[in-house]
């Protein structure tokens, strides 16, 4: 804190400080961002033409809002980034539990402090991050948690009678005063607690149990919810829904390129080890798995398939390739399609299955997703390439076994026995002839997986390739 920062009420007044409602603060700072062209939500991709404009409208209109979306759609991250639209620091009366404005305190504690100390009332400064409070709505949340209750222990220790305002133990809403309060999974909040939210959303105040006193809070309130839960009759009481001014619907990435950018941004890939080279086509396969899972009828689409799935798969396949590189003493870490199959544990736990899916099993569905995604990626690169010589090799009894821990050099040697395979990888631009063994091996695996998807050859659970129908 600089020497010029006011530490008393008198110094704050002399500085010309002007307090303003938090929604005005957010609005004015947002306008400044828009005028300067700064990015509003750094790290949030794919929402530039959908979610972000709706959020901007809500903030400019000074609205409380709810984000409706499935899991893994950056709802919580968006809410936490709202703090970037707050002032860097904000003055409060020192010791206040409800962030009393030194120029307009709302609590008895704040009023007494000013009455006792006048312009010498000490103030402290809150960073913008301290002005954000978040609560996960669960059925066991109580009114005391959210709004507050009497505290007999505080009354006894302070020598107060229970009717004294100073005996209040404030809940999260009052403690978020002059800031942002976020509640995740709103439909899980019990109806009687939802009723308790009425006043704060419409009149901007709360009533503490047993007190005629009303606290005039200054808040932006934001919620998140699953769309199906939010629209289900009886999950949200109608008067509460009516008081939420704006609904903003989030979504999964609309194209593979955006999904890949998000996955690469979020995945832990920079590791203190061997150099890492992830082929672009491997990244595409990983991302397409998520897109296919979101269209798979055996997967419960009401639950969604989180963007965390491709992130976890990418991290796991890198670990699989890293393990192989260490064991084989290879210089570079280059993931292959086989490493995606080794990453299935990162897939199965992130899909909620329908009844038919439960019958087939998550493992089988995950393997089918890998095969289908590899086939789509191969088709994008192949474009009707001539693969007759490769297919004929397997039709004539040729077999190719590719284990997850096989060295890249050994794989390239083996792939060289299949007529035209390495040449096709070069022709398609997947791996030039002078590329590393790791990249050439990965490219050949993609081609073979594409042929499996096209049912021209078959693949065993152990990574063996042979003629179709075997």
Task: Indicate where each model-derived feature is located.
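Charged, amphipathic alpha-helical linkers/stalks
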Residues: 349-393
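Short alpha-helical scaffolding segments that buttress acidic/His motifs in well-ordered protein cores
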Residues: 263, 286-290
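Conserved ASCE/P-loop NTPase catalytic core
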Residues: 2-257, 268-284, 292, 297-302, ...
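C-terminal helical "lid" subdomain and adjoining coupling/linker elements of P-loop NTPases
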Residues: 272-281, 292-366
